[in-house]
């Protein structure tokens, strides 16, 4: 099985940042991306396990994959649905 996180077109390192900074950085990064492009987010704030999926739902982006069993957490999102 291939690693979905390895296919990301963009990457955001949010390690050490605390709420609300990671989501603010995700929003800024996604704004610069084209529709359909992917972003890998690496974070260690436990709030991101709730905030990143909520951000995707609210802003109509796709959460392709997430790894939240251990830190650093990883999220792969696609701009748009």
UniProtKB/Swiss-Prot annotation:
Name which cysteines form disulfide bonds. none
Q: Which PROSITE patterns does its entry note?
A: UPF0033
Q: Which domain of life is it from?
A: Bacteria
Cytoplasm as UniProt keyword: yes
The UniProt entry's GO CC annotations, sorted and at most eight, read: cytoplasm
Q: Where is the active site?
A: 19 (cysteine persulfide intermediate)
Q: Where in the cell is it found?
A: Cytoplasm
GO MF annotation list: sulfur carrier activity
GO annotation, biological process: tRNA wobble position uridine thiolation
Q: Which UniProt keywords apply?
A: Cytoplasm
Family listed: Belongs to the sulfur carrier protein TusA family.
Name the HAMAP family on file: Thiourid_synth_A
Q: What does this protein do?
A: Sulfur carrier protein which probably makes part of a sulfur-relay system.
Protein name per Swiss-Prot or TrEMBL: Sulfur carrier protein TusA
Q: Which organism is it from?
A: Shewanella loihica (strain ATCC BAA-1088 / PV-4)
Coding gene?
tusA
